[in-house]
């Protein structure tokens, strides 16, 4: 309209109908349009009011229609939100995560699953062992079946890694593109799936003379507990007729703190035990994974005439 007035196509006294906005306007003597449908004639500054679609201090430009003003006041752009992708790793019929005795042979069977959310398409999904990729695919879920591994005095750590394309840009609530925070192309790594090799505490009793203290003898004791620590308390039940007691744990721990004969409340039984250092094998037995153990043995003069309990504190 302004261009037509300037060109002289339209001048004062004319009445025009605007096709694009469906408004009628009268051209006044000063060649300025007067709209039949109300429009603001001056700019309006928002002053002292908050919570509107436009902020305090902003300006509503002149020439806005009533509909446009209402929209500006009651419609406020809310940016789109984006959810990051994720990837998980789970057991798929192989060795569960957690602790095993050092020397145990495990077969990892794992499943890696990509959760796309607002990222682009998956391009690669991998199973990592430490920093090394041991298997990969292009579709989720990806199943990995590895070779048998002997876990030593260590933690074997697996994880899943997914590489993906850029995600699409969403619109805000007003239908306008809202790119801030959209997901760029990249990769994501799962939390660790750990299998830790740990040593056992061994303990038990027997009939007759105390046998020679060897790795094999220690490993054959009837009871065991994984990963003993300083301060651990455990009970050794001694049945009628038993004549010797043996317990053993890694030599990296302190000397036994206390052995209590529970039935008599005698806390000084540790002095009756003899400590011997023995190299004890890991779960494979034989000479595999030998580690120094403190082996405590106690030989009774006569077989136990009644049930007894030794409460041991490392």
PLM segments and residue spans:
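Short, solvent-exposed loop/linker segments at the N-terminal edge
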Residues: 91-108
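Solvent-exposed loop/turn segments flanking beta-strands in beta-repeat/beta-sandwich domains
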Residues: 115-131
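Short, surface-exposed terminal/edge motifs of secreted or surface/virion proteins that either
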Residues: 12-38
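Acidic, Ser/Thr
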Residues: 74-78, 110-119
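Surface-exposed, short loops/turns at beta-strand junctions within beta-sandwich domains
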Residues: 144-159, 164-178, 287, 297-307
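Proline/serine/threonine-rich low-complexity linkers at boundaries of modular beta-sandwich domains
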Residues: 67-90
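Short beta-strand segments within Ig-like beta-sandwich modules, predominantly Fibronectin type-III
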Residues: 131-143
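Surface-exposed beta-strand/loop patches in extracellular or lumenal glycoproteins
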Residues: 232-264, 310
């Amino acid at each position: 309209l302004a261009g037509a007035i300037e060109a002289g196509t339209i001048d004062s006294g004319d009445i025009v109908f605007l096709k694009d906005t469906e408004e009628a306007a009268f051209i006044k003597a000063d060649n300025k349009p007067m709209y039949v449908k109300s429009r603001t004639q001056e700019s309006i500054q928002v002053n002292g009011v908050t919570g509107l679609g436009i902020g305090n201090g902003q300006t509503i430009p002149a020439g806005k229609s009533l509909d446009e003003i209402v929209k500006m006041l009651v419609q406020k752009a809310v940016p789109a939100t984006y959810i990051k992708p994720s990837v998980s790793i789970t057991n798929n019929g192989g060795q569960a995560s957690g602790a095993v005795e050092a020397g145990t042979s495990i077969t990892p069977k794992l499943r890696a699953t990509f959760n796309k959310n607002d990222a682009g398409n998956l391009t690669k999904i991998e199973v990592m062992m430490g920093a090394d990729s041991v298997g990969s695919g292009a579709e989720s879920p990806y199943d990995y079946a590895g070779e048998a591994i002997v876990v030593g005095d260590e933690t074997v750590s697996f994880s899943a890694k997914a590489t993906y394309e850029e995600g699409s840009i969403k619109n805000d609530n007003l239908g306008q593109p809202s790119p801030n925070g959209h997901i760029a192309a990249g990769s994501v790594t799962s939390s660790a799936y750990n299998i830790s090799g740990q040593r056992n505490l061994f303990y038990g009793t027997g009939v007759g003379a105390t046998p020679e203290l060897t790795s094999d003898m220690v490993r054959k004791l009837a009871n065991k507990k994984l990963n003993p620590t300083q301060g651990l308390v455990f009970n050794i039940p001694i049945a009628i007729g038993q004549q010797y007691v043996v317990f053993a744990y890694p030599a990296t721990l302190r000397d036994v703190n206390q052995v209590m004969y529970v039935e008599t409340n005698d806390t000084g039984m540790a002095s009756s035990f003899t400590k011997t250092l023995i190299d004890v094998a890991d779960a494979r037995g034989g000479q595999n994974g030998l580690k120094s153990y403190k082996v405590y043995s106690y030989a009774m003069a006569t077989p136990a005439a009644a049930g007894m309990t030794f409460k041991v504190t490392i």
